[in-house]
Amino acid sequence: MEINTHNAEILLSAANKSHYPQDDIPEIALAGRSNVGKSSFINTLLNRKNLARTSGKPGKTQLLNFFNIDDKLRFVDVPGYGYARVSKKEREKWGRMIEEYLTSRENLRAVVSLVDLRHDPSADDVQMYEFLKYYDIPVILVATKADKIPRGKWNKHESAIKKKLDFDKNDDFILFSSVTKDGLDAAWDAILSKI
């Protein structure tokens, strides 16, 4: 499938399924801890500076943000999890919103689960991966911020992440940097193979 990534726009933000777009365009959701680099990942894939707003303030995305890409594909930016400065009630609300989308959305083809290559996955990262595996949702695991680690240490960090997640070798694992564009083609290949 040919996709013109320049033809991309934010379509809408939704709090529940009554607000989701009503059509059959395939969707790829993006999930990860606050400040893992989701917005930078989206902007890099779409070759845009700030289509997805990057923020120094974690926990900025509080709704599901739907990005229309060439009327052929949508990215769905899921609120970042694991941010402590949000009330427990607010976190539970986000949790329900995310769970509703991931378990009931027929358009969903796969989830790009983002983790920070520099650190072991958090308990929230592990829980998200287990959740996706439990519901049999295809996963593309993207380890971000690869430029912050010397290339010679990538394998060591990759192995540590896979071990902590009990990673399924049938899932895609991509080392990614929005700075150097490492992993850009691999990410698109993985996404397009799912739709």
Curated annotation (Swiss-Prot):
Swiss-Prot/TrEMBL keywords: Cell cycle, Cell division, GTP-binding, Magnesium, Metal-binding, Nucleotide-binding, Septation
InterPro entries noted in UniProt: G_ENGB_dom (IPR030393), GTP-bd (IPR006073), GTP-bd_ribosome_bio_YsxC (IPR019987), P-loop_NTPase (IPR027417), Small_GTP-bd (IPR005225)
Family: Belongs to the TRAFAC class TrmE-Era-EngA-EngB-Septin-like GTPase superfamily. EngB GTPase family.
Its job: Necessary for normal cell division and for the maintenance of normal septation.
HAMAP family: GTPase_EngB (MF_00321)
Record carries keyword Cell cycle: yes
Gene Ontology BP terms: division septum assembly
Gene Ontology CC: cytosol
Domain EngB-type G: 24-195
Pfam families: MMR_HSR1
Annotated source species: Streptococcus sanguinis (strain SK36)
Protein name: Probable GTP-binding protein EngB
Residue positions binding GTP: 32-39, 59-63, 77-80, 144-147, 176-178
PANTHER family linked to this entry: ENGB-TYPE G DOMAIN-CONTAINING PROTEIN, MSS1/TRME-RELATED GTP-BINDING PROTEIN
Gene: engB
One Gene Ontology MF term: GTP binding
Annotated residues for binding of Mg(2+): 39, 61
